[in-house]
Every structure is written in structure tokens, then in C-alpha cells.
Amino acid sequence: MLSMLWFLLSLLSLLLLPCLRPCFPAKGSLKNKKKIDKGTYVVGEEETPKELQRELMPRHVAVIMDGNRRWAKQTGLLTSQGYEAGAKRLLEFADLCFKLGINTVSAFAFSTENWGRHKIEVKCLMYLFQRYLKSKIQFFQSKEIRVSVIGNLAKIPESLLRTVHELEEATKSYKKKHLILAIDYSGRFDILGACKNIVKKSEQGLIREEDVDETLFERELQTRCTEFPSPDLLIRTSGEQRISNFFLWQLAYTEFFFSPVLWPDFDKQKFIEALVSYQRRDRRFGSRL
């Protein structure tokens, strides 16, 4: 009963959101609650933390942003505010990545399996996605960040789909910084879709059996939108140690970093710890040296 009451309060906050305040809180709006900007990501374009070597930075960092709901519950906030805090943290995280010379950031925002959550929660999430992405189009343009959204977008609400198309069109010319958002994404679905595309092209006489190799296959995956489709580093927060059907093909030789910290609390220092761990590893890509 209490959990349902909590959930209904979260929904009510979303319904009142456009009237009471912007979709995402301004800095300091969570005053008297647990602060989410501890360790705010501020680093100059030319500045690299002393613990890190810039030449060893990953080109593509993927993140599974786990723990937003638990963070909200622990801090006495509504579920919707937990997602808001997580979205704010993602922008800070991506901004630091780009300043450190990391070209591509991909974030697992909503899995295909997440449709199994309570319908009200899913509706809340879709509403938040649409409001947030719409409100940040000018921000992405000002930072010259290209945004791509991947996943089975056929099921998402029409309003969100229109915003996705608008955002991708507005940022498609930017080359140096690339943020990939996976919404209704499934690694299995991605691989299955690639197989179907190859079979279809084969039937049309566009490719032969001997043409099919890893390079051709990767061009049919949804990560073909980026120059670096395979992440060098995957970070998952909240202590969970699984990939949850994310980038099943692309993660073949990726280095993993699992953090016990909930995503809204994954600050600059925690990210530096992940990068230090990554840079100390001997990447072998399956070979025995």
C-alpha cells in the first residue's frame, strides 16, 4: 500500500511538473535534500587529472545508469526526482568525457525489458524523456554534441519519436562529440536485426555469402551511427554486475568497471577511479601474450 502511494505521488509530481517548474530542477532546487552535484564535473579542455594519461583515454565509454530509483528512495525524494537527478548526472558525465578527449559516450537509458515495469512508471519515463530531450536541443547545439538515439523506436510515444527526430536532425553535423542514447534497446534484437538485414540484402543480390565478415556485420548493427561502435570501457553503477542485454556484440573486448555507487552519486572522482582502473589494465583482445 505504501509503495503504491509513493508511486502515485511520483506520477502526480510529473503531471504538475509543467505548471510548477521546469522538467528538471535548477541548480540548488533540491536544497535540504542530499546534494547531487558533489564532485561536479569541471575540467578544462587542456587539463587532465594527474592520475590519468590522456593518450590512454578510451575512445568510447558506455554506461549503464543503475540506481536512480534506489537513490530517490534513500534520499526521501520521489521516483521522478531520482530520474531527474540521473539525467543531470549523465550530462555532467558526458561533458567531462568530451573534455578529456573521449569521443563517444553511450548510455543505456531504457531497455526492452523495462516495458515490463508498472505502466504508470513507464509512462512517467517516456514523459520525462520527451520533456528533457526537447528542453536540451539548444544545449547540445551550443556544445556541438551530436546525439543519436538507438533502439526499437516503434513502440515509443509519437511525441517522443518526433523529439528524437528533431534532436538528431539538429545535431547531425557535429563530429567530435557523440552521445548515444539507447531507448527500448535490446542487444539480442540488435543482432537479430543485423542478421535479417544481411539476409534481405543477400536475397536482393547486394551481397554474397563470402562478403559476410565481422566488418560487414557491424555495419548492420545500430551502433553503425558512430565511428567507434565497440566501447573500450563499460561502467555500471549501483553494485550490479551484469550487462542486462546491452551491446551483446559490441562488448566482446570491452573492459568492465562495476561501481557500488548509485548513478546520481557517481561523481567526478568516481569516474576518475574508473579511468585509472582502465588505464592500468593490459588489454589483450583475446590474445595470449
From Swiss-Prot:
It is a single-pass membrane protein. GO terms for cellular component: endoplasmic reticulum membrane. It comes from Arabidopsis thaliana. One of its GO terms (molecular function) is transferase activity, transferring alkyl or aryl (other than methyl) groups. It is found in: Endoplasmic reticulum membrane. Keywords: Endoplasmic reticulum, Membrane, Transferase, Transmembrane, Transmembrane helix. It holds the Pfam family Prenyltransf. GO terms for biological process: protein glycosylation. Its cofactor is Mg(2+). The chain crosses the membrane at residues 2-22. It comes from the Eukaryota. Catalyzes cis-prenyl chain elongation to produce the polyprenyl backbone of dolichol, a glycosyl carrier-lipid required for the biosynthesis of several classes of glycoprotein. Its EC number is 2.5.1.-. It is an enzyme of class 2 (transferase). Pathway: Protein modification; protein glycosylation. This is Dehydrodolichyl diphosphate synthase 4. Its main location: endoplasmic reticulum.
